[in-house]
Amino acid sequence: MKLLYTEISYSMTEILVKEARAYADKGYRVFYIAPNSLSFEKERSVLALLPEQGSFAITVTRFEQMARYFTLAKAANRQALDDNGLAMIFYRVLMQLQEDELKVFHRLRTDQAFIAQLVELYKELQAANLTAFDLTTLDRPEKQEDLITIMTKAEQLIAQGDYDQSSRLAQLAEAIKSKSLDDELRQTVLVIDGFTRFSAEEEQLLALLNEACEEIVIGAYISQKAYRLAFTKGNLYEASLAFIQQLAQQFQTKPIYTTSEKVFDVSFSRLTQLLEANHDYSQLDWQLSAKDKSKVVIWQALNQKEELEHVTKAIREKLYQGYRYKDMLVLLGDVASYQLQIGPIFEKFEIPYYIGKQEPMSAHPLVQFVESLERGRRYNWRREDIVNLLKSGLFGRFQEGELDQLEQYLVFADIQGFTKFSRPFTLNSSRQYPLPLLNQLRLAVVTPLQQLFKSQKQLGASLLDKLMTFFKTIQLADNFEALAGSRREADREKDEEVWKTFTGILETFYQVFGQEKMTLADCLALIKMGMQTAHYRTVPATLDVVSIKSYDLVEPHSKPFVFAIGLSRSHFPKQTKNTSLISDQERASINEQTASYQRLDVPSFENIKKNHQTALSLFNAATQELVLSLPTSLTNSSDDVSPYLKELIALGVPVIEKGKNRLSHSAADIGNYKALLSRLVAINRQGIADDMTSEDRNFWTVALRYLKRRLADEQLSLPAFEHHLTTKPVAPEVIETRFPSQQPLSLSSSALTVFYNNQYKYFLKYVLGLQEPESIHPDARIHGQYLHRIFELVTKDRSNAAFDQKLGAAIAAVNQQSAFQQVYQADAEGRYSLEVLKGIAYSTAPVLNLNQGMQVAKQEEAFELALGHQALIRGVIDRIDQLADGRLGIVDYKSSARVFDIGAFYNGLSPQLVTYLAALKNKGQGLFGAMYLHMQEPRLSLSDFKVLDDQLVAAAYKELTYKGIFLAQAKEYLANGSYHLNNTLYETDELETLLAYNEQLYLSAVKQIKTGHFLINPYTADGKSVQGDQLKAITRFEADLDLGYARRLVVLPAKERRQAFLTRMNEEIKHED
């Protein structure tokens, strides 16, 4: 074994490539080994250093891949399971285990995160040359017992599928021990680059290869100064030193110092030497020069967005200087927090990029399809699962409009479960659903699903055949291809990887579970688990892209220009978190009991060494310029400066406060089309910034003027979102079509209430005609109709029968009507509602029998009230009562408590009773009032009554009173009836004021409606909260941010409130006149 080390200012790759080439020229086969995370980049750099740009004798690869070269022929019929297959194995094991078989993990059997932990533990035990039986020092013996149970059954399933139970490295080690590879290995040389530690499995293999191979060459970056030190704890090179010294001791060889022809910029090595002195407690008699400080700089930005925009502008500047995208590298302190923002910002500046990170498949439509299919079977055709299955776009060939209609009908008819899905749709409503079309869609959905779901317990291979037949029937492959074809090229590459993973999971299922009997539910659950835990990685379509990855995966001298962002204290240094099933303390205890070449990694014990090594690589990652950046605000929370950056600042590395991106006329701002257009749109929205220079201000003013002129020529305009709740008027021709000018505008009291609640709600409901989802289940409207019908029959009954008999007969008759039978006898919920309503009817109806001097003149009386040629008000009055003197009163049944509030009426929110009075008055009828009757079952607190006597009955009847507007002149006729007269009596002139103001409310609304401009203005009573309908899903109204758009109601003090409102009404009426 040959151990090489060099200063970080030299190229270890060049040194090792030179060694590899020398052995290749002698006829040896050379394997150039790099870590998994660096193998792709290392292969490119190695090939670039070879004079012929390639070699058949030199293979750049990883340990595991190298093992395949030697063992592939000997294990041709056996494959290794990938992570997706292992997840399916463990899920199957946990499904088969009973709860009492697991003492610690029994509650986690179906937990996806637990299964992922088992997969990682299984692989980690393989790399550590351990089994679950070796975990003897866990905190709880029951924990080891559970792991032994799970791992043993998993290995049995793996053997059942004839998959490899050992790793590739273990197979190679066994082959070496058997002497079957001696001839090949004698002609083999290993060159190992980029490592600072080996796993136990790699150490064992390395020891065997050292005896069998011609040579093993290992290189590492270590300064000569560090190598000569006796005490290395906390040294910047501690990880590399420990690595090389341990190998030197084990294999009895002396490390050799060497150099490369290539020498990188001394500014980075000088910075490294100063840092090294800080960590080994020595001193240097020189400082960073001006040239050194120009090569390394620290940026401080306001937030992540500003930070990324500064980076993209800097990249574009480098492009103008003649560099290429592949010369740039962006390193992220925290990939997860930056990943969502990178795409939009880099695309705005038209910078191609590649993020070297595995992505989960869980959000892909194919995974959602599999999840919905499994849930549809498990939950017996639950509606939302079937709808999600169809909305994935992968089931059959349906038009979007057809699926919308089907979903609306499923909600309306409450189609749940196989029984309802299997029967023809027959129920309909006033909306007249297209039942023939819907039944065609139903058959297209139900037929293939029913064929699949009726599968009985059988072999996994047979179930998979049925599943493949189902996929063919619904045209899954064609639909997936159409879906991928409609997406961007980058997304199409992701789709290809997802499809490969999906087919791989099906193949694994067939191999492992093909000969095992199981139910369809278990089959789908296994495939779903494989899909949910799967990840994919795409490769860049071209090499000329900006590479983006986590900063802890970088190696020295990676790219000419490196931008490391997000280097806050929270992420630099990176704090390793142990999320496995075995704690660090347990790992350390296990390692004390194991033999050589058996070891579990203990992340926290090596954290400091690893972080120093990462910082060393990061500070030397660039060959020309290095930018280290941190946002002062990271994901909406402030963060402190990294201790490593504090060291650099103390050494004199300059800090630049980047601040907010300012618009200028520099090449970075105007040299890219999308970025230029984006800035012009921003200026159009926000105006020219005051802090611009006069030259910048002039440039952008002229550019914006020019763009607007060009857009006007094309009949286009710039978007403006600064007032996101500002609405545009409806086109006059649309208003004319919807509300013809030669006809009066049709209104109702409920439409007027909606208008004054929120004008935009009126627009949605009465102009666009949008409707809320309806349901076959009875709602408040149906309940009201039911009680109305009962009261109507009771009041029409002129027989001499007792009132209770009349009421019972009316209830029985209404219950037999088909419209009510359909909704109240369909299920238990409907029958329960019916019983509640019958109780309300029995409680409320007696009030009809109390006013013997009153006659019911009419019921369900329709009316039309014309307000000149401007408006026609239509409505239906529930009941009209008549006094003995012929005067009429209006009764409106309500299912909830309602009173006439003059303040609500003044603000347009309660015009119903006054509108009804106007309709009767218009016919020349005398009036005595208009009132609400709350249909209810009175509820009283018995604790309020000392004695349960007649007072309880009187209190119950007190709740059942008519409340509304009454004429003072009719008081003598009403005093002995069930009327609430306190503060509800109005003189004739006051009633005239109400009627006149009511007309003004209608005419004002008509005038606004005719303009076609509908405001988003839900009302607020207190100016602090919004009570009107905000329609958040449509308008994006946020009460705390958009309170200024709300319509403020007029609220007056309680003292003499009624008179004050009447006075205001009179004043406004006179003003209009």
From Swiss-Prot:
Keyword ATP-binding: yes
GO terms under biological process: double-strand break repair via homologous recombination
Provenance organism: Streptococcus equi subsp. zooepidemicus (strain MGCS10565)
Family note: Belongs to the helicase family. AddB/RexB type 2 subfamily.
Pfam families per the UniProt record, alphabetical: ADDB_N, PDDEXK_1
GO terms assigned for molecular function: 5'-3' exonuclease activity; ATP binding; double-stranded DNA binding; helicase activity; hydrolase activity, acting on acid anhydrides
Keywords in alphabetical order: ATP-binding, DNA damage, DNA repair, DNA-binding, Exonuclease, Helicase, Hydrolase, Nuclease, Nucleotide-binding
Misc. remarks from the entry: Despite having helicase-like domains, this subunit does not have helicase activity.
Superkingdom of the source species: Bacteria
Quaternary structure note: Heterodimer of AddA and RexB.
InterPro entries for this protein: ADDB_N, DNA_helicase_suRexB, P-loop_NTPase, PDDEXK-like_dom_sf, PDDEXK_AddAB-type, Restrct_endonuc-II-like
Protein name: ATP-dependent helicase/deoxyribonuclease subunit B
Protein's UniProt keywords contain DNA damage: yes
Function (record text): The heterodimer acts as both an ATP-dependent DNA helicase and an ATP-dependent, dual-direction single-stranded exonuclease. Recognizes the chi site generating a DNA molecule suitable for the initiation of homologous recombination. This subunit has 5' -> 3' nuclease activity but not helicase activity.
Cofactor(s) essential for the protein: Mg(2+)
EC code: 3.1.-.-
